């Protein structure tokens, strides 16, 4: 997997379940924007960038294929978020 070289956190304003947005840079060559840090019933989790389809459903714009890659991204985003608390 590409190395995560930077994570930027943008705190959300308001009291909704979305606590922050994040962008993740890989290998200092490309960036994925629009990840969300969401507070749910079981704690914080990270939502991958998605868009709403005409039928109202959501489709991921970016998502890791392997569990290992997903865990690496989620861990990096949550760590960066918690460091800003």
UniProtKB/Swiss-Prot annotation:
Q: Name one Pfam family in it.
A: SpoVG
Keyword Transferase annotated: no
Keyword Cell cycle in annotation = yes
Q: Which UniProt keywords apply?
A: Cell cycle, Cell division, Septation
> InterPro entries, alphabetically?
SpoVG, SpoVG_sf
One GO BP on record is:
cell division
- Please indicate which superkingdom the organism of origin belongs to: Archaea
Q: Which family does it belong to?
A: Belongs to the SpoVG family.
- What is the recorded function of this protein according to its Swiss-Prot or TrEMBL entry? Could be involved in septation.
Q: What is this protein called?
A: Putative septation protein SpoVG
Q: Which organism is it from?
A: Archaeoglobus fulgidus (strain ATCC 49558 / DSM 4304 / JCM 9628 / NBRC 100126 / VC-16)
GN (gene name): spoVG
């Amino acid at each position: 997997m590409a190395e995560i070289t930077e994570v930027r956190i943008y705190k959300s304003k308001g009291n909704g379940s979305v606590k922050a947005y994040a962008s993740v840079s890989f290998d200092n060559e490309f960036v994925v924007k629009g990840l969300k840090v969401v507070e749910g019933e079981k704690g914080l989790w990270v939502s991958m960038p998605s868009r709403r389809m005409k039928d109202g459903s959501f489709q991921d714009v970016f998502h890791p294929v392997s569990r290992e890659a997903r865990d690496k991204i989620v861990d990096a985003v949550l760590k960066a978020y918690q460091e800003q608390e």
